[in-house]
Amino acid sequence: MIEIMSDTLMDYIRGLSTRRKTFGAGQDLFNQGDDVESLYLVEVGVVHLVRHQANGNIAVLQRASSGVILAEASVFSSVYHCDGVAVSDVSATSVPVQLIRRALRSNSDFAEGWASYLSNQLQQTRKRAEIASLKTVAARLESWLAWNDVGLPSKGEWKALADDIGVSPEALYRELSKRRISFVRNGT
C-alpha cells in the first residue's frame, strides 16, 4: 500500500515539475542559507545533504538516491538548513516549492501521500540514528541486518552498505571476512 502511494506521489510530483536538472559529481544543488525555491526528486544518482561542523567534520544528514525527495523538510522553510551535494552524476526533477505547498493545501490525496512519505522517511532516519549510535562495525552490521530483512546485499552493493552504516568499505569488508571465516569454522 505504501509503495503504491509512494509511486502515485512521485508521479504527481513529476507532473508538477517545471524541469529536469543535471548535476556533476561534487556539484552543489543548493547551499545552506539559500532561499528554498525548489524541491528535487532524485531520478538518477546520489545526493547527500550535509552540514559542515565547527570542528571541520561533515555530517551527512540524508543520502538520497533514485526515487527520494531531497530536502523535503524544507518545504515550509524560507532557506535550506544544509547543503545538497551530488555524490555522483545526478539527474533530478525540480519542482517549485510553491506548487508543493499549493498541492498540500488543495489535494487531500496528495497531502496523505506526502504525510505517508514523511512518516517513512522519519522511520528511516531513526533507523540510521540507531545504527550510527553503535560503536563497532559488527554491531552496526547486525542492526542493519535486523532492520532489513532482505539479508546481506550482493557484493557489488557492499560499498553502499558501508556508507549506509557509516563505516569505511574496508572496515565492512574485514567484518564480512571475519563472518565468512566463522561460518566456515562452524559449518554453516
Where are these regions (language model features)?
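Phosphate-/nucleic-acid-contacting segments
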Residues: 135-188
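Short aromatic/basic micro-patch
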Residues: 20, 63, 94
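Cyclic nucleotide-binding regulatory module and flanking cytosolic helices
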Residues: 1-25, 69-70, 74-75
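A small-molecule sensor/coupling module
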Residues: 98-136, 140
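A short hydrophobic beta-strand segment most commonly corresponding to one strand
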Residues: 90-99
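Cyclic nucleotide-binding regulatory domains
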Residues: 27-88
